[in-house]
Amino acid sequence: MKFFVTGVGGQLGHDVMNELIKRGHEGVGSDIQEQYSGVEDGSEVTKAPYLSLDITDKEAVKRVIESVKPDAVIHCAAWTAVDMAEDDDKVAKVRAINAGGTQNIADVCKKLDCKMTYISTDYVFDGQGTEPWKPDCKDYKPMNVYGQTKLEGELAV
């Protein structure tokens, strides 16, 4: 299968891309930087095709995903500086990336009938439950701005 992986400059995207390639899949990575800026560890992700993409730019998302023609998208890109996301001057940017960017990717995947996997976070729950969360649990209680915007991303998918 051919995968398009967002956020390969971060830990999650880096590891997802390496695992896909290790399993014999074709992978195209992306992140906001002009060139790959993740860990230069010589692993497969550092040698794989890479495209710069600002996921908050709806037209760019459409153009890039249409050009890659993936069988599936694994969306790992996110604003992950949890504490900094609480700063009043950062909230709009965090929401634009985690919710709006995810919406942009989901819209294109739907239009192209392309599978999409979205990686969220446990911060969409408050951690106060007394029993394990069930897969279809809707008892959301985001802990902070990061959790709220990742939940908005979940709902976009």
What are these regions (language model features)?
Residues M1-R23:
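N-terminal Rossmann NAD(P)H-binding glycine-rich loop of SDR-like oxidoreductase domains
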Residues T6, S30, V73-A77, M116-T121:
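SDR active-site strand-loop-helix element
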Residues D15, E19, V108, A156:
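Rossmann-fold NAD(P)-dependent oxidoreductase module
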Residues K22-G38:
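Conserved glycine-rich Rossmann-like NAD(P)H-binding loop of the short-chain dehydrogenase/reductase
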Residues S43-K58:
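Rossmann-fold cofactor-recognition segment
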Residues I55-I97:
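NAD(P)H-binding glycine-rich loop region in Rossmannoid oxidoreductase-like domains
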Residues A92-N104, V124-V157:
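Catalytic helix-loop patch of NAD(P)-dependent Rossmann-fold dehydrogenases
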Residues K111-C114:
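A short helix->loop->beta-strand "cap" motif at the edges of active sites that frequently abuts
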